[in-house]
């Protein structure tokens, strides 16, 4: 096949893809994004991976409290000669936002920035597909479906849409990445290979931490200033706004729910399984007697960008590439290559809830009645 023949075939495939809606072929090959390192800037490499902690004490919980007044400077990825004073991990408690894992907040924020760089590049170049990997072996394929009038939009309007679409897509996909980690962990995946981690899946600090992290990242990226410095400032402000408490009240709040939410030997007694499927928001679990008005964490929406609905702009597919993928496909009931977060995550969450014999979203009053 000559170069001209190959070009003609690719053009025909691309045309058919456009006629059918979202892309059904890879044009250009998403692996090409790896040759655009200069354009991906400071986010061309995967961010550092931080070790989370369970929000209670016990064997293998890796529990440690974080000092919200001394979190250091957020660092996406420290170079060999750079000073790194980030306090990367630890649990805090907030009176409006519940328990939070600082490592998970930071990890989800950095994943948002990592995806945003790729989404922005893809949309600016008019690509229909881009792929990336996180810290696990799974591969994420993101298909982009541009509106029919995309090329007819004036440059300024398309530029505004591009920037906002990349930000919101990055938030939502990063949240999916973090949720996927919880799902495969529940099914037995071990990032440390040896230590069992299913006890850490969907603990009541995880989902709120992810939701907060992706929002802070978007806010930091919107400023156009240094990401690490903005993340440091925004994280401090967010924790203060959520009513972060001192270590002694953290201990009291943790003790109040011992036996109801967690057990020192058995681990978590309750799992927070609300991933915002129904209404796009996550209600934190706050401890009675240690709470002000709880504040829901809102996920980015695609249905109103300058008054325009972009709900169908993207689609995510996950190729598990982990042994736990077989069990996950069994739950879904279909032996297919990709997992679709939009349709499959609710099924997988329901399966977890059924195995725990709980409703998908636990109500605090019901929990209190079980104490």
Feature annotation, model-predicted:
Residues 1-2, 98:
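Intrinsic disorder/low-complexity signature
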Residues 2-11:
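Bacterial N-terminal signal peptides that target proteins for export
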Residues 11-20:
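Bacterial N-terminal signal peptides
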Residues 22-199, 218-371:
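Bulky hydrophobic segments
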Residues 174, 210-214:
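A structural signal for well-ordered alpha-helical segments within the folded catalytic domains
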Residues 182, 206, 212:
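Divalent metal-coordination and catalytic microenvironments
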Residues 202-203:
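Hydrophobic/aromatic-rich structural module bridging two neighboring secondary-structure elements via a short loop
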């Amino acid at each position: 096949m000559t170069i001209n023949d190959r070009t003609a075939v690719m053009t025909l495939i691309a045309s058919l893809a456009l006629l059918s809606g979202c892309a059904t072929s890879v044009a250009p090959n998403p692996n090409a994004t790896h040759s655009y390192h200069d354009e991906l800037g400071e986010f061309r490499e995967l961010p550092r991976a931080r070790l989370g902690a369970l929000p209670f004490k016990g064997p293998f919980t890796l529990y440690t409290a974080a000092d919200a007044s001394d979190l250091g400077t957020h660092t996406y990825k420290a170079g060999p000669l750079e000073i790194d004073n980030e306090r990367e991990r630890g649990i805090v408690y907030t009176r409006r936002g519940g328990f939070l894992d600082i490592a998970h907040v930071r990890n989800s924020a950095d994943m948002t920035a990592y995806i945003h760089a790729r989404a922005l590049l893809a949309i600016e170049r008019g690509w229909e597909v881009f792929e990336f990997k996180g810290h696990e072996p799974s591969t994420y394929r993101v298909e982009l479906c541009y509106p029919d009038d995309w090329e007819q939009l004036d440059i300024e309007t398309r530029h505004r849409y591009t920037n906002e679409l990349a930000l919101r897509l990055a938030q939502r996909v990063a949240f999916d990445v973090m949720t996927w980690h919880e799902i495969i962990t529940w099914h037995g995946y071990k990032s440390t290979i040896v230590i069992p981690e299913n006890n850490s899946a969907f603990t009541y600090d995880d989902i709120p931490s992810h939701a907060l992290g992706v929002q802070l990242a978007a806010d930091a990226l919107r400023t156009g200033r240094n990401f690490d410095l903005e993340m440091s400032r925004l994280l401090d402000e967010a924790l203060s706004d959520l009513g972060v408490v001192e270590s002694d009240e953290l201990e009291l709040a943790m003790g109040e729910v011992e036996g109801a939410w967690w057990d020192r030997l058995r681990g978590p007694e309750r799992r927070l399984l609300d991933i915002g499927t129904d209404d796009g928001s996550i209600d934190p679990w706050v401890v009675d007697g240690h709470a002000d008005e709880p504040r829901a964490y809102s996920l980015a929406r695609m249905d109103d960008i300058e008054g325009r609905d972009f709900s169908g702009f993207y689609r995510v597919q996950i190729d598990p590439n982990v042994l736990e993928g077989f069990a996950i496909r069994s739950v879904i009931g279909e032996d297919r290559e990709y997992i679709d977060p939009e349709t499959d995550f609710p099924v997988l969450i329901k399966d977890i809830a059924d195995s725990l014999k709980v409703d998908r979203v636990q109500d605090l009053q019901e929990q209190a009645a079980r104490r």
